[in-house]
Design a protein with these regions (language model features):
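Generic hydrophobic/aromatic pocket-lining and core-packing "Φ" positions
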Residues: 139, 252, 571-572, 621
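Terminal low-complexity tails and localization/encapsulation signals of metabolic enzymes
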Residues: 313-315, 326, 330-333, 337-471, ...
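Generic beta-strand/beta-sheet core signal
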Residues: 67-69, 111-113, 150-154, 184-186, ...
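Conserved NAD(P)+-binding/catalytic subdomain of aldehyde/semialdehyde dehydrogenases
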Residues: 542-544, 548-557, 602-658
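Conserved helix-loop functional segments at active or binding sites
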Residues: 92-95, 140-141, 168-171, 254-257, ...
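Conserved small-residue-rich beta-alpha loop and adjacent elements
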Residues: 541-607
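Catalytic cores of nucleotide-enabled group-transfer and carboxylate-activating enzymes in metabolic
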Residues: 37-48, 58-64, 74, 137, ...
Length: 658
């Protein structure tokens, strides 16, 4: 059903070329592979060529929706280029339509990320001001020719933004009464049924009959990876393919239940799914009720059994081919998605080619499969056993740090309240010693992006503070050295938990004192938390008081560009190894460091074991590094300063380099 016309030719050609080996021949082989796969998956290099190539299947009763290949715009120049490409395509498709209308004639699919280089929730106002007019102009052009325009689905973090654009488009007075607006919804998203409820309500409120293309989803791998990398609470998509199959059928039933406001377009290559929809929709089919869709180069053999008269043994249901248009150079990203999708061992396209899988297993009812799984596992809807939640990514030894989903409106509202609440915090940094410290006049710390904003005040350490701190560290060293590594690890883990709980105020402080964007600030806090947990594991697993002897007082000098992450990483590493720490933060960012130290002390680090000495490198830093009682220096910064420190320290190393 899903055989390709050039599988054998592709395999033999590549085998011959690779067999000759040599880099030039390998390059030629890859180039040939791209061209052969381009012929398989791309309808034409230009819209004119694609329209001509589509005529063969149109004669059999197939319809087409053309997609101009290309990924997200990275620059305004890219966006303008894609906009012009879409405009040209609509003119060409519209002329080729010959007035057949949105259901019988060809249409176009557009990718919103191609129309704006900053298509993200963080740039909401810009998207509405700059991207929406482009979307509207394309939709009006499609209306002029009466061809359908579908807004393609993309990553989950852009879903709500795309829905806002869709709603605004539906209430556009110039589009009143036109039913050619289309939207794509992904069944693998856990929100899919609720998105369908929303678009049904939107269609009723705006008095449009919306075209809704239901797909299973093409970004599964990246959605899983993004959730893990960003430390999200869970996954936006199902972790088991069979759940997506059931979701698809359930959502198809929803779409078919409201024919007055929704024109369903079912995009699937799964014969069982197709059959289920065919039976759910009933035998009383009428033109314009619904249609099936498939990808060019993949689904035509299956749908040749569907499109055509009943008298010819067909099902007499329409199918629209999703037809990519573009050069081989623009094919790669689309091709990778297709290969990932169909290379998965749960893919119907993959499984049908596997002769070891029986026809009964291939067309098994997904509901029955889930019931069987539930019997074996003791419950319904359990996640994939080999895909842990983002927090459990590193196993039982340590938790992954939690992030904040910056596309989640509830999280953004909570963050906004927290930032407002802490905006007037009286942030302070001063020497934090295990003994008495000096009392100097504090100086204001200004927001680098707004010098009118006084973030807080810093009192810099004096030479006497440095000398006293080193002596305090020496006094505290035996206590910390004798502390069992497991206890040191537990303290670092408590510090990580405290820091994670303070992510919102820390974000505000990082933004105001260090000039961080919120996305960078989240990453900074998470990295600091990860450092604390990582070194806790190292202490617990790799250190014993019998086998490892700490160095003694260690100076940690950190930079301004990572004032929390690198600062915390240096401190955590030294503490995990049993050393007392003298922390000298960058002079530009003492407030962040002071708050980090407060959290670590609150977690249970004894007085004198961790001390903060804010101040300038040429005074505080030089005094610390030059003292013979200091046994180790951890430094992150410029090469120039590193060489100065190296020269300073090298003169007092013993025969063992200590």
């Amino acid at each position: 059903l899903v055989s390709t016309h050039n599988e054998a030719g592709l395999t033999s050609s590549l085998s011959r070329i690779i067999g000759k080996s040599g880099e030039p021949m390998i390059r030629k082989g890859v180039d040939m592979a791209m061209r052969l796969m381009g012929e398989q998956f791309v309808t034409g290099e230009t819209i004119a060529e694609a329209l001509a190539n589509a005529s063969k299947f149109e004669a059999k009763g197939f319809r087409y929706s053309y997609d101009m290949l290309g990924e997200a715009a990275l620059t305004e120049h890219d966006a303008q280029k894609y906009l012009a490409s879409y405009e040209q395509a609509i003119h060409s498709i519209g002329k080729a339509s010959h007035g057949r209308g949105i259901y019988e004639g060809p249409g176009i699919s557009i990718k919103l990320s191609a129309l704006h280089p900053r298509y993200s929730r963080a740039q909401y106002e810009r998207v509405m001001d700059e991207l929406y007019p482009r979307l509207l102009s394309l939709t009006l052009l499609a209306k002029q020719y009466d061809i359908g325009l579908n807004i393609d689905a993309e990553e989950a973090d852009r879903l709500e933004l795309s829905l806002d654009l869709l709603e605004r488009l539906c209430f556009e007075p110039q589009l009143t009464g036109w039913n050619g607006i289309g939207f794509v919804i992904q069944a693998y998203q856990k929100r899919c049924p609720y998105v369908i409820d929303y678009v049904i309500d939107l269609a009723r409120r705006s008095r449009h009959r919306l075209m809704i293309r239901l797909v299973k989803g093409a970004y599964w791998d990246s959605e899983i990876k993004r959730a893990q990398v960003e430390g999200l609470e869970g996954y936006p998509v199902y972790t088991r393919k069979v759940y997506t199959d059931v979701s698809y059928i359930a959502c198809a039933r929803k779409l078919l239940s409201v024919p007055e406001v929704i024109y369903p377009q079912f995009a699937t290559h799964n014969a069982h799914t197709l059959s289920a929809i065919y039976h759910i929709a009933g035998q009383n089919y009428y033109p314009g009720q619904y249609e099936f869709q498939c990808l060019h180069g993949m689904g035509e053999p299956l749908y040749e059994q569907v499109v055509g008269k009943v008298s010819e043994g067909k099902l007499n249901r329409p199918c629209r081919v999703y037809a990519p248009v573009g050069t081989h150079e623009t094919l790669l990203a689309y091709l990778v998605r297709r290969l990932l999708e169909n290379g998965a061992n749960t893919s119907f396209v993959n499984r049908i080619a596997d002769q070891s899988i029986s026809i009964q297993e291939l067309v098994a009812d997904p509901v029955a499969s889930i019931e069987q799984m539930a019997t074996l596992e003791g419950g319904f809807g359990l996640p994939h056993p080999r895909i842990p939640l983002p927090r459990d990514l590193y196993g039982a030894e340590r938790a992954n740090s939690s992030g904040i989903d910056m596309a989640n409106e509830h999280r953004l509202a909570s963050l906004s309240c927290a930032l407002l609440a802490t905006a007037h915090n009286n942030w302070k940094a001063a020497p934090m010693l295990g003994c008495a410290s000096s009392t100097e006049t504090p100086a204001p710390v200004l927001n680098p992006s707004d010098l009118r904003d006084v973030v807080g005040y810093v009192q810099e350490a004096t030479v006497e503070d440095v000398d006293n701190a080193i002596q305090c560290a020496l006094n505290a060293a035996p206590i910390w050295q004798a502390t069992p590594p497991a206890e040191r690890a537990a303290i670092l883990e408590r510090a990580a938990d405290l820091m994670e709980g303070e992510i919102q105020p820390l974000m505000g402080l990082l933004a105001r004192e260090a000039g961080k964007t919120f996305a960078n600030a989240i990453a900074e806090v998470r990295e600091a938390v990860d450092f604390l947990r990582y070194y806790a594991v190292q202490a617990r697993n790799d250190f014993t008081n019998d086998a490892h002897r700490p160095l003694g007082p260690v100076v940690c000098i950190s930079p301004w560009n990572f004032p929390l992450a690198i600062f915390s990483g240096q401190v955590a590493a030294a503490l995990a190894a049993g050393n007392p720490v003298l922390a000298k933060p960058a002079e530009q960012t003492p407030l962040v460091a002071a708050h980090a130290v407060r959290l670590m002390l609150e977690a249970g680090i004894p007085e004198g074991v961790l001390q903060l000495l804010p101040g300038r490198g040429e005074t505080v830093g030089a005094r610390l590094v030059g003292d013979d009682r200091v046994k180790g220096v951890m430094f992150t910064g410029s090469t120039e300063v590193a060489r100065l420190l190296q020269r300073n320290i090298a003169g007092r190393l013993d025969a063992q380099g200590r």
